[in-house]
Amino acid sequence: VHLTGEEKSAVTALWGKVNVEEVGGEALGRLLVVYPWTQRFFESFGDLSTADAVMKNPNVKKHGQKVLASFGEGLKHLDDLKGTFAALSELHCDKLHVDPENFRLLGNVLVVVLARHFGKEFTPELQSAYQKVVAGVATALAHKYH
């Protein structure tokens, strides 16, 4: 991912304020509600029958936190996202058979959730930087599919 020094600083500064548990659960929950076909990967999570059930589901929250913690690790290695996410890419490709398009969808949902949580602080410039990052992470996670 090519970010300017200013963009890297802004992305890192905002990430330091992110409540990974809250934002992760909301982002994964929104993915499952907005794109319901993604629920098939989470059948073991229990009740996903309504938007309310999804958003309150403790398994969704827990996995969302795990996903966002991994994303945060990626922010520490922006110059080597493919290396950082190689094992996760292999897992999602070979064992879980996740459609790599879902990584892009989740990245876009994450940007929406960050905008919701940070309001005016989430400027268009910061959104642009985060869009670059989530696109880079999605590409890295899809790497083993090629």
Curated annotation (Swiss-Prot):
Organism superkingdom: Eukaryota
Modified residues (S-nitrosocysteine): C93
Record's keyword annotation contains Phosphoprotein: yes
Binding site for heme b: H63, H92
Chain positions found as N-acetylvaline: V1
BP GO terms, sorted: hydrogen peroxide catabolic process
PROSITE patterns named in the record: GLOBIN (PS01033)
Residues annotated with N6-acetyllysine modification: K82, K144
Residue positions where Phosphothreonine is found in the record: T12
InterPro entries: Globin, Globin-like_sf, Globin/Proto, Hemoglobin_b, Hemoglobin_oxygen_transport
Gene3D superfamilies in alphabetical order: Globins
Tissue: Red blood cells.
Matches recorded under SUPFAM superfamilies: Globin-like
Alphabetical keyword list: Acetylation, Heme, Iron, Metal-binding, Oxygen transport, Phosphoprotein, S-nitrosylation, Transport
Annotated Globin domain residues: 2-146
Residues annotated with Phosphoserine modification: S44
Assembly behavior: Heterotetramer of two alpha chains and two beta chains.
UniProt record similarity statement: Belongs to the globin family.
PANTHER family xref list: HEMOGLOBIN FAMILY MEMBER, HEMOGLOBIN SUBUNIT BETA
UniProt name for this protein: Hemoglobin subunit beta
Organism per entry: Tursiops truncatus
Name of encoding gene: HBB
